[in-house]
Design a protein with these regions (language model features):
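ATP/nucleoside-binding phosphotransfer catalytic cores, i.e., glycine-rich phosphate-binding loops
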Residues: 127-129, 148-270
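Catalytic core of DAGKc-family lipid kinases
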Residues: 1-142
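Flavin (primarily FAD) binding-site architecture
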Residues: 145
Length: 270
């Protein structure tokens, strides 16, 4: 139970507090305290992030591409006030919108639910390769003030799966329309350039750029890594990242807020 209590206090340190919003429905210390007093315990799925050689960290959500580059730019301007820093990074990254070339390998959830041997499952990996504006991997709904339905409304706290959300390369105008949908009750995935999958494992392998954008490889080589947004924390990694969900790995104080009434908010930065 000491481990559980530690995570309760940790949830309020992130930028968007997605875990606090998902567990309590609101970012409110008194509400969280009441859940502890009343003994509300909720099992939660957790992801591991690793390379072929080492474990990187644990987490609940990840973004590669736009979401990660926005955070990386914001971290370089920590001298700015928090709200201004986030708006500046968002607008600057959106103005310089570029796709990431990478290969995604994933194991669909239904494959592991079939009565097959583990060795057969290795042949069931699916792959997609291309240029993506953003790749999101979410083990929980990821509710927050800017996304009342959640960044991944089709997943749950403890159903043993992850939502893989792939945004293909498209125009800036269409991408903004997709982002604005998160702030409403409309389906943010109802676009031809957005693909969603329910998975148990994902491998993300960045590819070096070719053609006119090849000069960006020099900058990436100098930095030695690609940015990742893990629960609002910046992580940099140069090699393939393997994300795996571990069903109901930990117990946290809180409840399942899946049945909360949907609400609408407005976004001041779009």
């Amino acid at each position: 139970m000491v481990f559980t209590a530690f995570f309760f206090f940790f949830t309020f340190t992130g930028t968007t507090n997605i875990l606090a919003h998902t567990l309590y429905g609101i970012k409110h210390a008194v509400t969280a305290t009441l859940h502890i007093v009343m003994g509300h315990i909720q099992a939660v799925d957790v992801c591991t992030f690793s390379t072929p050689s080492k474990l990187l960290r644990f987490g609940f959500s990840a973004m590669f591409g736009f979401g990660a580059r926005t955070l990386a730019l914001a971290e370089k301007h920590r001298w700015m006030p928090s709200s201004q820093r986030k708006d500046f990074a968002f607008i600057k990254t959106l103005a310089d919108l570029k796709p990431e070339e990478c290969e995604l390998s994933f194991l669909p959830l239904q494959i592991l639910q079939e009565d097959t041997h583990e060795k057969d499952g290795k042949d069931q990996w699916q792959k997609i390769q291309g240029h993506f504006l953003n790749v999101s991997i979410m083990a929980i709904p990821c509710l927050c003030s800017m996304a009342p339905r959640g960044l991944a409304p089709n997943t749950r706290l403890n159903n043993g799966s992850m939502a893989l959300i792939v945004v293909q390369n498209t125009s800036r105008t269409e991408f903004i329309k997709h982002l604005k949908r998160y702030t409403t009750a409309k389906n943010q995935f109802n676009f031809p350039f957005v693909e969603t999958y329910t998975v148990r494992e994902v491998k993300v392998q960045p590819r070096l750029k070719s053609g006119p954008d090849a000069q960006e490889n020099v900058c990436l080589s100098a930095e030695g890594s690609y940015p990742w947004n893990i629960d609002g924390d910046l992580m940099k990694e140069a090699s393939e990242v393997h994300v795996r969900v571990h069903p109901q790995l930990i117990d946290l104080y809180g409840v399942n807020t899946d049945d909360l009434e949907s609400s609408q908010v407005t976004c001041s930065c779009i």
